């Protein structure tokens, strides 16, 4: 299958997952903090680490990397939403939540990429 179609297919799945996860997190925790965006970014970062490590070890095809790594995870994770939600918190004067959002997204996402890679490298 053409890689462009695989990216489009993965992207449509990732976008739907992001939407459903965000709605679920608002229902569970409310809308005072962007937990949905945090969760999709952390989960997507972990999965990106796994996909990257598997790709480095030639255990997945370029087509699967296009489907999952570029398409699904590219649509699942979202830097633009993270940035907008952080700015909104700042504009509302909630500097603590804005700072917490930045620190949590950056530190947890970096750690999850590392963890995903280490999990794969230690098992294979």
Curated annotation (Swiss-Prot):
Reported regulation of activity: Na(+) is not transported, but it plays an essential structural role and its presence is essential for fluoride channel function.
Compartment annotation: Cell inner membrane
InterPro entries named in the record: FluC (IPR003691)
Chief location bin: membrane
Record carries keyword Ligase: no
HAMAP family: FluC
Family: Belongs to the fluoride channel Fluc/FEX (TC 1.A.43) family.
Protein name: Fluoride-specific ion channel FluC
Species the sequence originates in: Shewanella sp. (strain ANA-3)
Organism lineage: Bacteria, Pseudomonadati, Pseudomonadota, Gammaproteobacteria, Alteromonadales
Gene: fluC
């Amino acid at each position: 299958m053409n890689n462009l179609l695989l990216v489009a297919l993965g992207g449509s799945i990732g976008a739907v997952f992001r939407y459903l996860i965000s709605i679920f997190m608002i229902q569970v925790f409310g809308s005072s903090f962007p937990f949905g965006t945090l969760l999709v970014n952390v989960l997507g970062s972990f999965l990106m680490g796994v996909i990257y490590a598997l790709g480095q070890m030639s255990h997945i095809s370029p087509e699967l990397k296009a489907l999952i790594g570029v398409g699904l995870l590219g649509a699942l994770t979202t830097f633009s939403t993270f940035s907008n939600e952080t700015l909104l918190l700042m504009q509302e004067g909630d500097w603590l939540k804005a700072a917490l959002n930045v620190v949590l997204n950056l530190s947890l996402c970096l750690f999850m990429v590392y963890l995903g890679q280490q999990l794969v490298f230690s098992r294979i």
